[in-house]
Every structure is written in C-alpha cells, then in structure tokens.
Amino acid sequence: MISTGIAAQNRKGRFNYTILETLEAGMVLKGPEVKSLRLGRATINEAYAGDRDGEIWLFNSYIPEYQGGVLSRFETRAPRKLLLHRKQVDKLLGAVARDGVTLVPLDIHFNARGVAKVTLGIGEGRKKADKRQAIADRDWQRDKARLLRNKGRE
C-alpha cells in the first residue's frame, strides 16, 4: 500500500518530450479508484491531458478495478477531471494552443496528506536527433561517473 509517494510514473514522458514547465493538479476519483491507486497498479504511459468544456481532463489513464470490494465496478480508462484554479487552467490552455505543445502527465503520486495528485508537464515533442542526443548525454554521464568512481582504485 502506498500512503505517500509515486503510484504511477510515465517514464517515457521526459524522453519523448522536452518539459518546459511542471504543474501539480488534484484528481477527481472514486473510493475504489483510490484504493487501486494505492496498490500501485495504475499506468499512465499512454495517458494525455486535454481540454473538455473549458476544464482539464486526464484521458486514457489505466486504473484497474479494485479486487477487495464488491461494489468496486468502475470504468478502467474513464476520463478523469483534474482540479486546478481557473488561472492555471487558462495558462495551460494558452500553452497548448501553440503548435507542438501538449500536456503530458508525468506521474500520479500521493502528497504528505495522502491526497492523489498528478504532475502535468507542458512539453514540446522531441525529434529523433534530440532523442539520440539525450541518450548520448545520459551515457556520457554514466561513463563519467564510472571513471571517477574507479579512478582511486588504479
């Protein structure tokens, strides 16, 4: 059971997109959805956030049915409303109006009070060359750390 910490993470989100800014939003969830999230079985790899009637919603996130209860029937891929202030919604909708910018859910976590939150990133899609450069940079950082770690042993 996860009382605080990350319940689901979109690991490809930071790789496929250059994240310009992050924002934390609350989620409207039912009881069995929260229990299922606390078990850590949710996935947001194909999820995205978008506009519906002037509000921000999370689409295509997968929260499996909670197996512990009898009345735990809910749609696993239902759109879920995100709770934001009006100024934040206007800012996000203005950012998404630009070409090539999208809202990427980066993780779902429980804060210190045990409330489910989703971290949204305003991201621009990366080209294939940018992804290759990111891989090369990551490999160089790993090799550099290995060289520094082994330097004293020689």
UniProtKB/Swiss-Prot annotation:
Gene3D superfamilies: 2.40.280.10. PROSITE patterns: SSRP. GO terms for biological process: trans-translation. Pfam families: SmpB (PF01668). It comes from the Bacteria. GO terms for molecular function: RNA binding. GO terms for cellular component: cytosol. The keyword Cytoplasm applies. InterPro entries: SmpB, SsrA-bd_prot, SsrA-bd_prot_CS. It is found in: Cytoplasm. Keywords: Cytoplasm, RNA-binding. Required for rescue of stalled ribosomes mediated by trans-translation. Binds to transfer-messenger RNA (tmRNA), required for stable association of tmRNA with ribosomes. tmRNA and SmpB together mimic tRNA shape, replacing the anticodon stem-loop with SmpB. tmRNA is encoded by the ssrA gene; the 2 termini fold to resemble tRNA(Ala) and it encodes a 'tag peptide', a short internal open reading frame. During trans-translation Ala-aminoacylated tmRNA acts like a tRNA, entering the A-site of stalled ribosomes, displacing the stalled mRNA. Belongs to the SmpB family. This is SsrA-binding protein. It comes from Gluconacetobacter diazotrophicus (strain ATCC 49037 / DSM 5601 / CCUG 37298 / CIP 103539 / LMG 7603 / PAl5). The gene is smpB.
